[in-house]
């Protein structure tokens, strides 16, 4: 737990130092406007796309499981 918190603090310090020298970009998503460093915007869009992909794959798997009938319920009578 301490190692996790330490690595998060270390990563936060790296982001702070890197953002002080980065180009600022204004991003507008409808009514939401955000001014952030360029690499932060790229990271946010990457992780949002990654999360959307994971959610869509999980949704497809769940719908396929609901449509399939379980194999053990099939009884063959001779």
Swiss-Prot record:
Subcellular location: Cell inner membrane; Magnetosome membrane
Transmembrane segments: 39-59
Function statement: Essential for magnetosome formation.
Lumenal side: 23-38
Record's signal peptide: 1-22
Membrane-related topology note: Single-pass membrane protein
Origin: domain of life: Bacteria
KO phenotype (gene knockout): Cells have no magnetic response and no magnetosome membranes. Deletion of genes mamH to mamV (amb0961 to amb0978) gives cells with no magnetosomes and no magnetic response.
Protein name (Swiss-Prot/TrEMBL): Magnetosome protein MamL
Miscellaneous field: This bacteria makes up to 20 cubo-octahedral magnetosomes of about 45 nm in diameter which contain membrane-bound crystals of magnetite (Fe(3)O(4)). Expression of just the minimal mamAB gene cluster (amb0961 to amb0978), including this gene, is sufficient to form a minimal magnetosome chain with small magnetite particles.
Entry keywords, A to Z: Biomineralization, Cell inner membrane, Cell membrane, Magnetosome, Membrane, Signal, Transmembrane, Transmembrane helix
Family: Belongs to the magnetosome MamL family.
Induction: Part of the probable 18 gene mamAB operon.
One CC-aspect GO term: plasma membrane
Cytoplasmic side: 60-78
């Amino acid at each position: 737990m301490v190692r996790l918190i330490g690595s998060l603090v270390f990563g936060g310090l790296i982001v702070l130092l890197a953002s002080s020298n980065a180009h600022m970009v204004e991003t507008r998503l409808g009514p939401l406007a955000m001014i952030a460093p360029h690499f932060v915007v790229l990271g946010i869009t990457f992780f949002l796309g990654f999360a959307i992909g994971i959610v869509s794959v999980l949704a497809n798997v769940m719908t396929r499981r609901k449509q399939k009938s379980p194999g053990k319920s099939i009884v063959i009578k001779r």
